[in-house]
Amino acid sequence: MAEISAKMVQELREKTGAGMMDCKKALTEAGGDLAKAEEVLRKKGLSAAAKKTGRAATEGAVASYIHMGGKIGVLVEVNCETDFVARTEGFQGLVKEIAMQIAAASPRWVRREEVPADVVAKELEIAKAQAREQKKPEAILEKIATGKVEKFYSEFCLMEQAWVKDDKKKIQDVLTDAVAKIGENIQIRRFARFVLGEGLEKKQENLAEEVAKAAGLQK
C-alpha cells in the first residue's frame, strides 16, 4: 500500500475543501491515488464541490457559439447561484468551453437520465444481436450489452463525454473543478446544436475536426 504523506493530504484538502481526516481516509481507500481519492470524497458528499451541487442555481447565462464559416451553431444554458458569478470571466470562459465541446463532440443529451427508455432498450437489443452474430455465449450477452450501452452514454451524454481539450477528463470533471474553483453550484441545464443543411443531401465533411482546429486543438 502506498504511503500517505502529509503533503498528499494537504494537496487533496486544498483541492476539495474536505477535512484532514476525511482526506487521509480517502487517500488510504484509493491507495494513494489523488484523483481516485477525490472521487471517493465526492461520492461520500464530503468534498466542497459535492456539497455545493445541492444548492439552487437559478442565475447563469445562455451563450452561443458559431463555428467558423457558420456551419455549426450552439446555444447552451449554464446555471450558477448568483448574477455576480455569472458575469465573471471564469464563468463566461467555462460556458464558452462547454459550447465548443457541444459543437465538436455532438452530444444528444446533457446526462444519461434524459435518454428515453425506448432508446436505451433499442441500444441493448442491437448490442445483444451483434454479440449473437459474433457467437458470444448467451450467458454473457447481458454483460456485453450493458457495456455497449455505457459506451453509448459516454459518446452521446455531454456530462460523460471526454473533454476535447483533455481526454483524461470528462465534462463532469471539468464542471466539478469549476464548482470548487468558483465556489458556487454550476449546472448545465440544456443545449441546442444546429448543423447547416442537416437532414439534406450534401457532401460529407468532418465538422468535428473543423471545430477542433478552430479551437486550436489540431494543426
UniProtKB/Swiss-Prot annotation:
Subcellular location: Cytoplasm
Gene3D superfamilies (UniProt xref): 1.10.286.20, DNA helicase RuvA subunit, C-terminal domain, Elongation factor Ts, dimerisation domain
SUPFAM superfamilies: Elongation factor Ts (EF-Ts), dimerisation domain, UBA-like
Location of region: Involved in Mg(2+) ion dislocation from EF-Tu: 82-85
PROSITE patterns: EF_TS_1, EF_TS_2
Pfam assignment, any one: EF_TS
Keyword terms: Cytoplasm, Elongation factor, Protein biosynthesis
Top-rank taxon: Bacteria
Main location: cytoplasm
GO CC, one annotated term: cytoplasm
GO MF term list: translation elongation factor activity
Function description: Associates with the EF-Tu.GDP complex and induces the exchange of GDP to GTP. It remains bound to the aminoacyl-tRNA.EF-Tu.GTP complex up to the GTP hydrolysis stage on the ribosome.
Protein family: Belongs to the EF-Ts family.
Protein name: Elongation factor Ts
The organism's taxonomic lineage, starting at the top: Bacteria, Pseudomonadati, Myxococcota, Myxococcia, Myxococcales
